[in-house]
């Protein structure tokens, strides 16, 4: 790294120290109002590449070795939902368990995953990786492997199998009723390398973003808990997924075009809040 890791245009800089105040790891020093911010010694090593400094500067005065203001999308306040719209959006989220048989184009799924990838990650590690199982026949094949795992659990760990109603689930599956993957056309799996310290929460957060974004694209989702557990512990399914070495799955969702439309928002139990 060189001194050019951070470049501040003196003609544009307001010398207000906003960039230094917003830097989460404090690698920008600010002597005081009227002075130019500057990179602290060794700061380039500590930078987590979040882009806060470039994003928050009102005059686009700062650029980094890897990021300039021109690389960024301007914030359009007209596109931001207000408080009422945001609450309505979140309240209308439903777990979709009935899907049309039509497949979703790969380009649409990629767009959805790109949106989900805007989710925050611990220390801005950007640790989340994605596996998209697009082939519906492959989804059916993998679903059958989950059923095999359930049969194993019924035999070897009956108490846990009873707790999760696995016997009933398998019985339904054998009769053609898929309550494992709900006959969804696609599955999206969020993964991360085992070395990532916040891998599990990063993947869960990204999948939450994905399910909130999906309806805007005419898509529905449902968390695939049985699939994710089986993918974690059942060797045949782990082998079939063939994740890169050192990478583990931390969550999965079913994705497809909803068969039905919801018309009302059921009330939710009031939040349990403790004030200190």
Residue ranges of predicted features:
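Acidic, surface-exposed loops and disordered segments
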Residues: 1-276
């Amino acid at each position: 790294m060189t001194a050019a890791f951070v470049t501040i245009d003196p003609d544009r800089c307001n010398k207000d120290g906003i960039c230094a105040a917003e830097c989460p790891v404090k690698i920008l020093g600010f002597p005081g109002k009227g002075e130019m911010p500057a990179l602290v010694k060794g700061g380039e090593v500590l930078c987590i590449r979040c882009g806060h400094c470039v994003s928050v500067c009102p005059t686009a005065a700062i650029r980094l070795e890897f990021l300039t203001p021109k690389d960024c999308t301007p914030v359009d306040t007209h596109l931001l939902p207000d408080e009422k719209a945001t609450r309505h959006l979140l309240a209308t989220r439903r777990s979709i368990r009935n899907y049309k048989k039509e497949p979703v184009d790969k380009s649409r799924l990629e767009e959805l995953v790109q949106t989900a990838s805007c989710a925050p990650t611990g220390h801005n590690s950007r640790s989340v990786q994605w596996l998209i199982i697009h082939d519906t026949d492959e989804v059916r094949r993998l679903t059958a492997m989950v059923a095999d795992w359930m049969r194993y659990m019924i035999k070897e760990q009956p108490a846990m199998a009873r707790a999760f109603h696995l016997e009933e689930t398998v019985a339904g599956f054998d009769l053609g009723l898929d309550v494992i993957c709900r006959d969804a056309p696609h599955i999206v799996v969020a993964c991360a390398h085992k070395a990532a310290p916040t891998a599990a929460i990063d993947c869960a957060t990204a999948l939450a973003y994905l399910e909130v974004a999906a309806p805007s694209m005419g898509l529905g989702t449902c968390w695939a808990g049985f699939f994710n557990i089986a993918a974690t512990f059942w060797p045949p399914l782990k082998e079939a997924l063939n994740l890169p070495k050192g990478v583990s799955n931390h969550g999965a969702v079913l994705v497809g075009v909803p068969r039905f439309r919801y018309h009302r928002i059921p009330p939710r139990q009031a939040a349990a809040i403790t004030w200190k």
